[in-house]
Structures are given as structure tokens and as C-alpha cells.
Amino acid sequence: MNSPSLPAVERLDVQAFINAQPLSPYQWRIVLLCFLIVFLDGLDTAAMGFIAPALTQDWGIDRASLGPVMSAALIGMVFGALGSGPLADRYGRKLVLVAAVFLFGLFSLASAYSTNVEQLLALRFLTGLGLGAAMPNATTLLSEYTPERLKSLLVTSMFCGFNLGMACGGFVSAKLIPLFGWHSLLLLGGLLPLVLAVVLLFRLPESARYLVVRNRGSERVRQVLAPIAPAQVALARSFHVPEQQTVQARNVFAVIFSGTYSAGTLLLWLTYFMGLVIVYLLTSWLPTLMRDSGASLEQAAFIGALFQFGGVLSAVAVGWAMDRFNPHKVIGLFYLLAGVFAWCVGQSLGQVTLLATLVLLAGMCINGAQSAMPSLAARFYPTQGRATGVSWMLGIGRFGAILGAWIGATLLGLGWNFEQVLTALVLPAALATAAVLLKGLVSHADAG
């Protein structure tokens, strides 16, 4: 390389460097590993909803008894998400990710050997700690290795792994549970993450942006960036992230609640919270609602899986649209359509083909919107507080998941029918739509 180019790389801007390069095989490996993390997160998260009919029959308990168990993992996810963000901003994304995947694999495996509700409740809570920590940190790490032009597309594509994992849980459970019992799905959801944790330990790099911001040394930064463009990285004497000069705060919480970010933070929380009310009410109780309405166990599992599979189909499209149009309006449209299709699902009981189609469309809209939210959050926050900002949105949102699962159990206990439960979902869909559109108006987020 000619000497006149040397000054331009003596102090290399990490994000500008990533933006200027084509996506390398090294970055594709990071995409794949983060996708697998989120896929297994989704598989394990949905497991209780799919094993619930067989579990209640096997243990001779009523479905209301599983309400606390359904919520236990979600409560664990709250603590896992809220605690992992600050840890990742302090100690690194990779360390927290490997520990999280190992944790949810270990306790999912242990859950398969539960003999009563109390044991299962405790083990699902512990599983939830790992599940809650994994997703936000996978989002953060991937976003810090992607160019701005592809950030939303790649992060939402990664997030479709969550929906694909949930969908695969339904398809696999429809085959495994009749043959091997409810334990088999939990065993599968435990063994696979343990294998992945070992792979992550050796093949997943630490975030270069994190290493720069935490002053971990130029050689470490050079080591993790070199596979992208070795010659250019070799010429850099030091590395920097420009936002370091513009965001000053004593701790990560001061960053996400500073005047620049406070309103956007609260609106992100509200949006994601309302979206998860819808997702987890349907994830936890749609198979049971179908069974109560006369569907077979296999039909209930299949239609429940279609809801998750819809998110796989839409996630890439949402990410593509966010990189080209106003991301807040794109996400708002999907939340709005989710409410419309949820209402339509409630009017379609007894028409199996129409019902399955509408469930798929509802899943495309709500899961597509939810998949896009971590990308929106990752683009909104600076490096110093990115893991905390993303993980706290996901953590606070989990209260919506808990509420959704609880509302489903409560409404069924009150005797609400299929149509009434689905119609009620119009309200959280409307609130999510309003909140994300308002964030686009009042915050300093990148509007596309």
C-alpha cells in the first residue's frame, strides 16, 4: 500500500472500517453463531407451551397449575436480561454469552428429570436466567460487527432464529412427544446449547468496539479485526470509536437515562412490553385454546408452530425495509397489522385452512415487529451503554411476557372463549403501534 494512505489508518475508526468493507466470511461466522444462540433460545422458550397438554395429562394436574411454571422461566428471563447487560458492558459480550448458553442448556436438561410442579418451577426459573441473558448480548455483539448499511437486515435475520426455534419446537414436539413423552423436548433443548457453548468459547470473538471503549489494548483489537481486512488493520497504530468523545457518563445507566436517551428508552420499553403481551399469550395458550375448541393435539401443535414460523418469513423483510425506510414507521405498521390479524383469527374458528393462514399472518406481523425491536435499540444506544440498553428493553419487556401468560390463564379461568381472547389482543397491538411511532418523533434515534 502506498505511503500516502498511512495517516488515514494510523488511528482507525472501528465502525467506519467495518462500514467500508464487504461482509467477510469471519463476520458471516459471527452471524451464524449468534443465529444459533437465538434459535436455541427460541426452542427452549417455547418448550413449556408445547409440552403443557402432555404434561398435565401425565401428572394428572389441571392447566392452571402450570401457570406459575409458565411464568417462572419468564421471571428468570427478566433477571437474566437486566443483570447481563451491565455485566456485558463491564466484562465483555463474549464471556456473558458463553455463560448464558451454558446455563440455559444445563438447567433445561435438568428440567427434563422433574417429578413435580415445584421442581419444574425452580428449574425453569434457572433456565430463564440463561435465556434472558443470551438474546440481548447476541444482538449487541452482532450489531457491533455489522456495517450500518446491513445492520437492521442482519440483526433481524438473526432474530428470526428465535421464531424458527419456537416453530421447530412445535414441529418437533408433534413428532417427539407422542413417541417419547414430554421429557424429550426438554432433553433436546438442553443438550444442543451445551454443545454450542463449547463452540462459542473457541470460535466467537469479543466485540472490537467494546475492546476499544474499555481500553483493552490495540493488540487485542487488531487480533479480532484482522480477519476482516488484514492489510488495513496491520497499518493501524491505534483504534477509536468517535462516540467516546460525545457520550460522557459515570455508568451505563446514566447513559441510557441521559437527556438524549431517556424518552426513547421508556418508549422502547413500552413498545416491546406490549408486543410480548401478545406473543406470550399466544405462545403459551394458543395450543391449549385450540385443544379446547376441538382440535387434535397434532393440529394444535402445528398451528401453534405456524404462529412462530410467520416470524421467520417476515424478519428478513422487516430488516430490509428498516435499512431503507423510516424504521419506526415500518415497525409500527407491523404492530398495527398484528392487531388486525389477531382479531381475524378470533373470527375464524372452525375453518381450519383459513384459521391456519390467519395465524401465520398474525405471526408474521407480531413476530416480525418484535424481531426488529432489538435492532432499533442497538442502533439507538452508544457502545458504552448498548448492551445495557438492549438488555433492559428485553428485560422490562419480559414483564409483558409474564403478563401475557398470566392474562391467558386468567381469561381461560374466567371462561372466555377463543374469539374473546383473540379480540382482546387488539389493545396491546394498538399501544405498541402508538409507542414506536411516538419514539420516532421524540427521540434522537436514527430514522433511516
Swiss-Prot record:
Q: Does the keyword Membrane apply?
A: yes
Q: Which family does it belong to?
A: Belongs to the major facilitator superfamily. Aromatic acid:H(+) symporter (AAHS) (TC 2.A.1.15) family.
Which positions, given as ranges, span the membrane? 31-51, 68-88, 95-115, 120-140, 153-173, 185-205, 262-282, 302-322, 330-350, 352-372, 399-419, 422-442
Tell me one Pfam family matched here: MFS_1
**What keyword terms does UniProt attach to this protein?**
Cell inner membrane, Cell membrane, Chemotaxis, Membrane, Transmembrane, Transmembrane helix, Transport
Q: Which PROSITE patterns match?
A: MFS
Question: Record's SUPFAM superfamilies?
Answer: MFS general substrate transporter
* Single GO BP term: chemotaxis
Role according to the record = Transports 4-hydroxybenzoate (4-HBA) and protocatechuate across the membrane. Driven by the proton motive force. Also functions as a chemoreceptor, which is required for chemotaxis to aromatic acids.
Top-level taxon of the source organism = Bacteria
- Topology class, membrane: Multi-pass membrane protein
Q: Give the encoding gene's name.
A: pcaK
**Entry GO MF terms:** transmembrane transporter activity
**Residue ranges, Cytoplasmic side:** 1-30, 89-94, 141-152, 206-261, 323-329, 373-398, 443-448
Localization annotation: Cell inner membrane
GO cellular component entries: plasma membrane
Q: What is this protein called?
A: 4-hydroxybenzoate transporter PcaK
Look up keyword Disulfide bond and say if it applies.
no
Stretches assigned to the Periplasmic side: 52-67, 116-119, 174-184, 283-301, 351, 420-421
The UniProt entry, under InterPro entries, shows: MFS (IPR011701), MFS_AAHS (IPR004746), MFS_dom (IPR020846), MFS_trans_sf (IPR036259), Sugar_transporter_CS (IPR005829)
